[in-house]
Amino acid sequence: MRDRILLVGTMAAVALTLALPQAQAKGGKTVELKDAKGQSVGTATLIAKGKGVEIKYHLKNLPPGEHAMHIHQNAKCEADPAAPADAFKSAGGHFNPEGKQHGLENPQGPHAGDMPNFTVGADGTAKGTVQDPRVTLAEGAPNSVFANGGTALMIHAKADDMKSDPAGNAGPRIACGVITK
């Protein structure tokens, strides 16, 4: 009887261990975004959807107005509070594994990390969903947000003009979150 209980317990533990990575993969990846002072400005959850990734964001303490959101090439969000205009340069440029030009309206684009603008309300909050069909959560794919150690989700001070190369005149980087496995 005791051996039977041990066997059932061991089988349950193995089944649970095998199921956990799949549950995490199906649930997506949640990223905390912080400003240059290290204060949280909210979260974004990346979920595999169709041929791309759906990003659900819940943001706070941001300047009202239209802002750009991009995926950047490095999984780094090093900020310098003394030089906010240069914050998060460690994240590199836009994620662009296919070597295209910037902008959703650019015939030679877009970068894999280019996405539509979003609006922050007068109260400093924004909640919404954006789809990026050019990236994936699948490890090993060249357009995976986890490639080369990961990427970063970036919020800029201004809206992206959707065509200027290399970054859409979106202004300083004001919030950043690291995307890693």
Predicted regions and their residues:
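Bacterial N-terminal signal peptides that target proteins for export
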Residues: M1-T10
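N-terminal leader/targeting pre-sequences
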Residues: V14-K181
